[in-house]
C-alpha cells in the first residue's frame, strides 16, 4: 500500500513539474489588456483571410500602415516545421527555418508557438524576450498564436505586442 501511494505521489509530482516547465501546459497569465484583445482579433481575422485566399493573401498582410501591419504590430506565418512563410516586419526571414532558435533567456519560443498551435485549443498566448524595433536589448513580448491550414498544410499565424 505504501509503495502504491509513493508511486502515485511521484506521478503527481512529475506532472506538476512538467506543467511548471512546459509553457504550453502552464503559461503565465495570458494578457487581458485592450491591446491583447486587438492582437487576438487581428490574428483570428488573418487566419480566416489566409484560409480563404491562401498565399494570395500574403501581399495584403505585408502592406505597411494597414490594418495588418502598423507600428510594431505585424503578422508572421510558419508551417509546423518552423519554416517561415511570412514575416511582414522581417521579410528576409521568409524561407528560413527557426528550429532551435532561442530568446535571450534560452527559451525555444518558436517551438512554443508550434506547440500552442498543435494544442487541443489550437490557439493561445506565448511570452518570450525579443528586441523592440530599432533596439538590440530584448524586452518581454507576448504573441497570440493560432493554428490553421494553409492549403492543407498545418500552419500557424501570430502577432505580438510589448506589454510595457
Regions found by a protein language model. Give the residues of each.
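N-terminal membrane-sensor/transducer module of prokaryotic signaling receptors
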Residues: 2-6, 11-164
Amino acid at each position: 500500500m505504501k509503495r502504491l501511494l509513493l508511486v502515485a505521489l511521484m506521478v503527481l509530482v512529475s506532472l506538476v513539474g512538467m506543467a511548471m516547465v512546459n509553457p504550453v501546459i502552464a503559461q503565465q497569465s495570458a494578457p487581458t489588456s485592450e491591446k491583447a484583445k486587438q492582437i487576438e482579433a487581428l490574428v483570428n481575422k488573418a487566419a480566416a483571410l489566409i484560409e480563404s485566399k491562401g498565399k494570395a493573401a500574403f501581399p495584403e498582410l505585408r502592406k505597411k500602415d494597414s490594418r495588418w501591419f502598423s507600428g510594431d504590430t505585424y503578422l508572421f506565418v510558419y508551417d509546423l516545421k518552423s519554416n517561415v512563410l511570412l514575416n511582414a516586419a522581417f521579410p528576409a526571414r521568409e524561407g528560413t527555418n527557426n528550429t532551435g532558435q532561442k530568446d535571450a533567456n534560452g527559451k525555444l519560443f518558436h517551438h512554443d508557438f508550434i506547440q500552442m498551435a498543435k494544442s487541443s485549443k489550437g490557439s493561445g498566448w506565448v511570452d518570450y524576450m525579443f528586441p523592440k524595433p530599432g533596439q538590440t536589448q530584448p524586452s518581454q513580448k507576448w504573441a497570440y498564436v493560432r493554428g490553421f491550414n494553409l492549403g492543407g498544410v498545418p500552419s500557424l499565424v501570430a502577432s505580438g505586442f510589448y506589454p510595457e
